[in-house]
Amino acid sequence: MISTSARGSHELDVDVVIVGAGPAGLTAGYLLTKAGKSVAIIEKDQTYVGGISRTVEHEGYRFDIGGHRFFSKSQQVVDLWNEILPDDFIQRPRMSRIYYEGKFYSYPLRAFEALRNLGLWRSAQCMASYLQYKLFPIRKVTSFEDWTTNQFGKKLYSIFFKTYTEKVWGMPCDEMSADWAAQRIKGLSLWGAVVDGLKRSLGLNKLNDGTGKQAKTLLETFRYPRLGPGMMWDAARDKIVATGKGQVLMGHALGQLASDGQGGWRLRADGPEGETIITARHAISSAPMRELATRLHPLPATTLQASNLKYRDFLTVALMIRSDDLFPDNWIYIHDSKVQVGRVQNFRSWSPEMVPDQDIACVGLEYFCFEGDGLWTSSDEHLIAQAKREMDILGLCKPEDVVGGAVVRQEKAYPVYDETYAENVEAMRAELAERFPTLHLVGRNGMHRYNNQDHAMMTAMLTVENILAGEQVYDTWCVNEDAEYHEAGDEGAETTLPARETRALSEDQAAALASVRDVPARVDKAPDTRNETERKVA
């Protein structure tokens, strides 16, 4: 219910207040209102819901911020997508390539194409390096470089992983935790890529063959909303509001989230018409943990740890080009160090309805940066000029063919996995769970996990189950805990929610569960203890 106080601020009282209208926040809001709970969602963006999964529109052109395939092994997630957006999915072919030294490589690699492009001598070096690391692997795997070198060999790692990865994260690969590699490319290896490339080259590859073993990059098609991922989240917002139980307050930033000392919450949101006060029995936050810590009252004891969490930011420069489509790919990965762009999207390849003019090609150049650095603070005009220049360097288009451009910035797009992130996250998680059991953290930034859209949704789904049950039935932090990339195997293959342990684990049970992780979570700065042979190979 909405009221206006004597001081002029708006006041609401709801069952649940939600910070952030991204996939996690809107999933929670949709399921809660469907169950009859009253909900208020605050979103600091004045125009768009969906967070990093939003779709931005500019003069009729639609831009997907980062590219979002709709695939999940969770049948509950698939069913929810279909429930929210029943009639607007299209099936799209998947095509991505790597650009390296002026040549394009299919991704996944095609064996014969890679041999032709790399040449016999370099290909032989790649295979020799791969065999060396299979015979003498790095035993103490701590960094992205260690993990990927063990999987592919040093030579192939340096060609196809190092440059692009360092563009994405802005740090050397040997300083980056192995978590990212384990999550995003687990299940792939040089041998697997070669075998799959041979099958593809000979026409023997099967699409989603039901084995549940296909790794993420081997999927051939995907579903996609015809007007971009934002179409899904616009629909979720509209359904929340249509119930009469939910409100989505746009342009409202989190000012303070205060505990009332009795398990309830008082949230202050700063909006275009002043402040809004929302009281609620439960609070769900998808805000970055670092940001949440400074706005909680009383302040958490772990605020310092939260302040040390880091993020990688992101911007897209969309160019409208008078041309046929420049390439058929959904996107191409730019491994060339001569340009700053990391990836180039072809928006029409995602959906023809994203580009209104058939005579115009529309692409998005993706740049990875830190908020406040030279790229982030550059003017839109400068960024558009840089994008035109780099497209020319790559040989994809001439600057004079560009007829329009737009820039979209996304802060805190990626939570950074550095040496201390795991202990910082765990410290804050443990404190909040003990002190504030009615405060629930969900989503990518809410949990500081580099999760996909369906993972973010699942954390919200589990949280809603807990709220409706009145107790913690499920452990939301177990979602994707094994660092296995979720987009693998058959869509909808998993049909049940993971059950939470109801008893405390014994010490040896906890140790056994911890042993399933193949790589440590943080970079270990201990002295190099590898044997002499391993050091020579490295």
Positions of PLM-derived features:
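C-terminal lid/capping helical subdomain adjacent to the catalytic/cofactor pocket in oxidative enzymes
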Residues: A6, E419-A538
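Glycine-rich FAD pyrophosphate-binding loop
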Residues: T33-E57
